Regions:
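Aromatic-acidic/polar surface patches that form glycan- and anion
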Residues: 8, 81, 221
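Extracellular calcium-associated, cysteine-rich motifs in secreted modular proteins
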Residues: 204-253
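Short acidic, glycine/proline-rich loop/turn micro-motifs
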Residues: 26, 75, 243-244
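Right-handed parallel beta-helix
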Residues: 1-25, 29-51, 58-71, 84-97, ...
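Non-transmembrane alpha-helical segments in soluble domains
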Residues: 41-42, 185, 229
Length: 253
């Protein structure tokens, strides 16, 4: 969880390219987002019972993949009071052995959603054959917006391409994946045949992380020691000879 510093409300947070998987029972959840200006982008949710994610406030949910939920997937406010807004664009949902039902649920008319290009593979037959989710499967009766709310401008890929464009590199994939990440990626590629919820890390077939040997890569050249490799800085217009990692750019980063 992320807590505030007492100086104002949380906001302007992006969580991207992350694997959010295998929350432990009996509270196995992907995440509760109830602040404004939160972006969830190109993440992979696997083997979480619920909240993949649960959204309140004003937020955007773009190009995420969700696999094998049980009681809840994208929860639209949870029938809560207050007015909420979300852009949900280009997301892919694949049901697994836990069942899961519809990808979008928990709404009421106070939840306003701009929903475009969201697809679901519901039949758990081992074959990737999704369909575009119709408005009738956004359970609870949300209010559909005809245009997106103002949010951060993101490159958005078609949902049906995410297995090729996002899945191979999501998470800590360099120099190569650890056991846990390979395990959940393999579950996704089973298209409904593999997966489950766990209550302790040691129940996984490869043991707990403390049992693993460390995998090492080769450190990339970084002349100024600012954590950004020289090659990346040269390609992106920053100075590889100046320690400027903490400099705030004109775009706020």
């Amino acid at each position: 969880s992320i807590s505030g510093d007492g100086k104002g409300e949380l906001g302007n947070i992006t969580i991207q390219n992350s694997i959010i998987s295998q929350g432990l029972q009996t509270h196995c959840a992907g995440g509760l987002v109830q602040a404004d200006n939160i972006t969830l982008y190109r993440n992979l949710y696997v083997d979480n019972d619920t909240r993949n994610a649960k959204i309140k406030g004003k937020n955007q949910y773009v190009n995420n993949i969700v696999y094998n939920w049980a009681s809840g997937c994208f929860i639209m406010g949870g029938d809560s009071e207050g007015t909420h807004y979300a852009n949900a664009q280009g997301n892919l949902f694949i049901n697994g052995p836990m069942g899961g039902g519809n990808a979008f649920g928990g709404a009421n008319a106070d939840f306003h959603i701009y929903a475009v290009d969201n697809w679901q593979d519901k039949d758990k037959d081992g074959v990737f054959d999704p369909y575009e989710i119709p408005k009738s499967e956004y359970s609870g009766g949300p209010t559909f917006m005809t245009s997106p709310m103002q949010a951060y401008d993101l490159p958005i890929e078609p949902a049906t391409s995410l297995l090729e464009t996002s899945l191979p590199t999501v998470g800590a994939s360099l120099p190569y994946r650890d056991y846990a990440d390979w395990y959940v990626i393999n579950e996704v590629k089973s298209f409904g045949k593999k997966g489950g919820l766990i209550s302790r890390e040691t129940s996984l077939p490869f043991g707990a992380p403390t049992d693993w040997a460390l995998w090492e890569g080769n450190k990339k050249a970084d002349a100024d020691g600012d954590g950004m490799p020289d090659a990346w800085e040269s390609a992106n217009g920053t100075d590889p000879a100046k320690n400027d990692a903490m400099t705030i750019a004109t775009n706020g980063y």
